[in-house]
Structures are given as C-alpha cells and as structure tokens.
Amino acid sequence: MSDSDSDSDYELTLSANALAALEEFKREEQQHQEAFQKLYDETDEDFQKKKKEEGMKLFKEDWQLSQFWYSDDTAAILADAILEGADENTVIAIVSAPSVYAAIQKKPTNEIPTEHIYLFEFDKRFELLAGRDHFFFYDYNKPLDFSDEIKGKVDRLLIDPPFLNEDCQTKSSITAKCLLAPNDNSKTKKGVFKHRLISCTGERMSEVISKVYSDTRITTFLPEHSNGLSNEFRCYANFECSSWKFAS
C-alpha cells in the first residue's frame, strides 16, 4: 500500500469518526429538546415541583453563548449572599447567572424573604425557570434595552457577564448601574444594609472591574463551575458576609 493510500484511508476513518460523533451529538440534542418540550406539556404543579428538584439539570450549557453553570455549592453560596438579611420589600436582580436563580428557587419558601427576584438573561429558555413575570430578556450589547419599570428599583444585584473582555464587562456595568437604586445606606427590616452588588468574572478582568464598579473589592470567595473552567474566576463585591471577606 502506498503512503497516499494510507493517508487516504486515515482521512476516511477520521471523517467517519467525526461523522459518528456529530450524529451522536445531534441525537443527544434531540433527546434534550424533547425532554424540554415535555416540561411545557406538564401541569404547572408538576413543573414547579420538577423545577425545584432539578434546577439547572433541566438546562444544557450552550458554549456558543459562553454558558458555564456554577457548581451547586457555588450557586448556593452566591444565593445565600444575595438573600442574606433581605426582607419582603427587597428587590433583587440576577443578571446572566441563571444557576444562582435556580439555587434560590431550590430553597424552602420560608428561606426566600422576597418575591421580587428577577432574572435577566439572553437565553429565552430561562423564562421557563423564572416565569414570565420575573424574566427579562437581556442582551448586553443593548445594555439599556429593557422595561423602564425596574430601572433604578433594584436593591441587590448579582452579575456574571458572559464574556471575559472589556467591552462585555463595561456594557454589562451600564445595565447594573441603571438597575440599581441609589445607595442611601438604608437598612432592611432585619437591620442589614439593603444595597449589595456582586460581580463574578475572570481574575484577568480585575482592572476593568475596579474601574466600572469602584466601590467593589475582590473577595476571598472563589467561584467554581460544574464542568470546570480554565479561566481563574473571582468574586467581587461591595460588602462582606458570612461566606467571604475582602481579600487583603
């Protein structure tokens, strides 16, 4: 057999393997879509129960949208931090971090102090998670393109912009500043400062974060992702809590 024949056979084998992998991927996608569609057909009671139990397991990551879900522990810690000391009047926005929203929903009802918790997300699948009344379609390229009714009304905000570049971080910060109510150092009925801001993003974005959120500092908390992520992630916040302190 000539070298050219060997090369040709190798290319054919490689192509066959690639084709098989593609077909398997398509099958998995189809199965996932069918399972997802089934959720729409269930009664509201059945779905609410499943949503609480399954959380982010219902939603497959779309890497083209730079979707990387937090680990369960990380999502739970961030959920606790944003809820800590809130009362029934506290307004909370979760921006581009649906796994934190899912972690909040998993909590017992008596551990969720407010009904005013909203999800801002580009992926419209998550309207199913949050519900129509608590979901805002959000595209960071249009940072002010959402309902005026919530602008300047948010007391606490957690944001995890999808891309680790200055453009995305800066545009996302425009959204955050538009949503947040002025910080007047008022406290909730539980005696905790009402205003809180959390930004989770890559360590290499630290200079950008210090510029766009001048009142935040890097914390000791290290966010982790369920499927691993090569980029070092950090949590920036303008407050300390039971889960973290400001890093020295």
UniProtKB/Swiss-Prot annotation:
Any one Pfam family match given in the protein's UniProt record, by short name: N6-adenineMlase
Top-tier EC class: transferase
Coarse class of the protein's main subcellular location: cytoplasm
UniProt KW Membrane keyword: no
Domain of life of the source: Eukaryota
Coiled coil stretches, renumbered: none
Any single GO BP term: methylation
Annotated compartments: Cytoplasm
InterPro entries xrefs: DNA_methylase_N6_adenine_CS, Efm5/EEF1AKMT1, Mlase_EEF1AKMT1/ZCCHC4
Its EC number(s): 2.1.1.-
GO cellular component, one term: cytoplasm
GO molecular function, one term: protein-lysine N-methyltransferase activity
Keywords: Cytoplasm, Methyltransferase, Transferase
Family: Belongs to the class I-like SAM-binding methyltransferase superfamily. EFM5 family.
PANTHER family noted in UniProt: EEF1A LYSINE METHYLTRANSFERASE 1
Biological role stated in the UniProt entry: S-adenosyl-L-methionine-dependent protein-lysine N-methyltransferase that trimethylates elongation factor 1-alpha (TEF1 and TEF2) at 'Lys-79'. Required for replication of Brome mosaic virus (BMV).
Further comment found in the protein's record: Present with 3060 molecules/cell in log phase SD medium.
Entry protein name: Protein-lysine N-methyltransferase EFM5
Gene (name only): EFM5
